[in-house]
């Protein structure tokens, strides 16, 4: 029997958080080996564990996988969260890329100066409500199913819920004009594996605090 996947990253969300979400939603137990200091990262680089000298890195099925997109695609495919055919995969990819763009803007916020951060929060909420969420609201309406693609849970649904919860941390009523997304959030949050991941004490990570931000800067030298 193969061991549990092992995730190598800092204690923050970053690019590993979507991987944590996907594994948790698939009901897969995983271990984490945290990068606490610069020397931990250097050790991974020096022992040849990081193909491009970067994390996230996930040990799974005898591989040391890097590049978050590749890791996510592998997990989605392995655990039947990637559609039933090529066309469904294309839609899942498009929806995931949209939420990836939105979450990428949010992930950058803690490392920005206060004045820049304030402007970007306004930009993110505007983009979320005019560019991204209308697409997903329409997709749910047109598709007429509980899910974005097909008639079962997919990576696209999991990623969208993650994005919704991240944007709600910036503006709690951000879904006020999107009734189908509100209902979607309720449904997805009650999927047993996801519900478990959303409980206190899970491996889901909180937003970065000032101490964590300083440590991340030190580890990655920026």
Swiss-Prot record:
Its EC number is 2.5.1.18. Keywords: Cytoplasm, Transferase. InterPro entries: Glutathione-S-Trfase_C-like, Glutathione-S-Trfase_C_sf, Glutathione_S-Trfase, Glutathione_S-Trfase_N, GST_alpha, GST_C, GST_superfamily, Thioredoxin-like_sf. Pfam families: GST_C_3, GST_N. One of its GO terms (biological process) is xenobiotic metabolic process. GO terms for cellular component: cytoplasm. Residues 3-83 form the GST N-terminal domain. Residues 85-208 form the GST C-terminal domain. Glutathione binds at residues 9, 45, 54-55, 67-68. One of its GO terms (molecular function) is glutathione transferase activity. Gene3D superfamilies: 1.20.1050.10, Glutaredoxin. It catalyses: RX + glutathione = an S-substituted glutathione + a halide anion + H(+). Belongs to the GST superfamily. Alpha family. Homodimer. PANTHER family: GLUTATHIONE S-TRANSFERASE, GLUTATHIONE S-TRANSFERASE A1. This is Glutathione S-transferase. It comes from Gallus gallus (Chicken).
């Amino acid at each position: 029997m193969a061991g549990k996947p092992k995730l190598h990253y800092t204690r923050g969300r970053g690019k590993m958080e979507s991987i944590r979400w996907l594994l948790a939603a698939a009901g897969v137990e995983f271990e984490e080996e945290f990068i606490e200091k610069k020397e931990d990262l250097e050790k991974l680089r020096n022992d040849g564990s990081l193909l491009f000298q970067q994390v996230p890195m996930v040990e799974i099925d005898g591989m040391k996988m890097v590049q978050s997109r590749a890791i996510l695609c592998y997990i989605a495919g392995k655990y039947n969260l990637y559609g039933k055919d090529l066309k469904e995969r294309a839609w899942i990819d498009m929806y995931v890329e949209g939420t990836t763009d939105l979450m990428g803007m949010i992930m950058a916020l803690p490392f920005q100066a206060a004045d820049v951060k304030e402007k970007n929060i306004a930009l993110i909420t505007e983009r979320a409500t005019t560019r991204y969420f209308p697409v997903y609201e329409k997709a749910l309406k047109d598709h007429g199913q509980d899910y974005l693609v097909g008639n079962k849970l997919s990576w696209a649904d999991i990623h969208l819920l993650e994005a919704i919860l991240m944007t709600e941390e910036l503006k709690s009523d951000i879904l006020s004009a999107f009734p189908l997304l509100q209902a979607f959030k309720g449904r997805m949050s009650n999927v047993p594996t996801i519900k478990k991941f959303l409980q206190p004490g899970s491996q889901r990570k909180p937003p970065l605090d000032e101490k964590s931000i300083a440590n991340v800067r030190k580890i990655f030298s920026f």
